[in-house]
Amino acid sequence: MKPISNPMGLSPTKQNVYDSVVLTTLQDVSNWVRLSSLWPLLYGTSCCFIEFASLIGSRFDFDRYGLVPRSSPRQADLIITAGTVTMKMAPSLVRLYEQMPEPKYVIAMGACTITGGMFSTDSYSTVRGVDKLIPVDVYLPGCPPKPEAIVDAIIKLRKKVAQENGQDRLNQNQQHRCFSVTHRLQPVPAVHNGEYERNITRQVPSISLDSTLQSPFEQILQSSFESVSETTLIDSQRYDNQYLQGAEIETGGLE
């Protein structure tokens, strides 16, 4: 009995081909590619960045996640703000974030970056939360966070990137922000009001002294300089005379 040449069903060859084909969408492929190409922009302003620097070493080896530190915002898609952000540095941070290409992500690292930390109550120059300037994707609390915590934050960010939709990313709006305490500074009057310069001790002395002395100030200075010079001249002449007398005594003794 001869076997059927064209049996009903899939051939083994076609079955192997179907097993090797993966059906996906362009968005999923894009997310999968970006998982291993998160290039962080190093933005360390305080002590938290020391922990991030130890993450670059061989002990933790964050290169396995495809992280390549960059120094240019145009080549980075992840910025890790590590440390205190001051009022003067805020415009520079916003400009760096705007120069990064889309899609871009932010990790707020440390208590000082998230809420202002120990400077959140009585500091007039500290930004109380970097999310007031730029949108934050992952909050990493700690003072400072350990390198293991940084790795955990990167893993959570990778999960977010894997489930991301491009349209949702464009319509993203920062709504949930960390609570920060308002400052307790009391307004004080201005210090530089001119009172110090108008103080009598800061006034320039007049050219002449009291009118009862009948002697101008410049003449008194000149007379004091002349008396000092005369005293110096008399002392030098006296020293010369003593030196000559001593020399004559020594010469007479030799004779």
From Swiss-Prot:
Q: Determine if NAD is one of this entry's keywords.
A: yes
Record-linked InterPro entries: NADH_UbQ_OxRdtase-like_20kDa, NADH_UQ_OxRdtase_20Kd_su
The entry marks the following residues as binding [4Fe-4S] cluster, namely C47, C48, C112, C143
Keyword list, A-Z: 4Fe-4S, Chloroplast, Iron, Iron-sulfur, Membrane, Metal-binding, NAD, NADP, Plastid, Plastoquinone, Quinone, Thylakoid, Translocase, Transport
Catalyzed reaction equations: a plastoquinone + NADH + (n+1) H(+)(in) = a plastoquinol + NAD(+) + n H(+)(out); a plastoquinone + NADPH + (n+1) H(+)(in) = a plastoquinol + NADP(+) + n H(+)(out)
One cellular component GO annotation, for this chain's record? Answer: respiratory chain complex I
Q: Which family does it belong to?
A: Belongs to the complex I 20 kDa subunit family.
Q: Which HAMAP family match?
A: NDH1_NuoB
- Name the UniProt record assigns to this protein: NAD(P)H-quinone oxidoreductase subunit K, chloroplastic
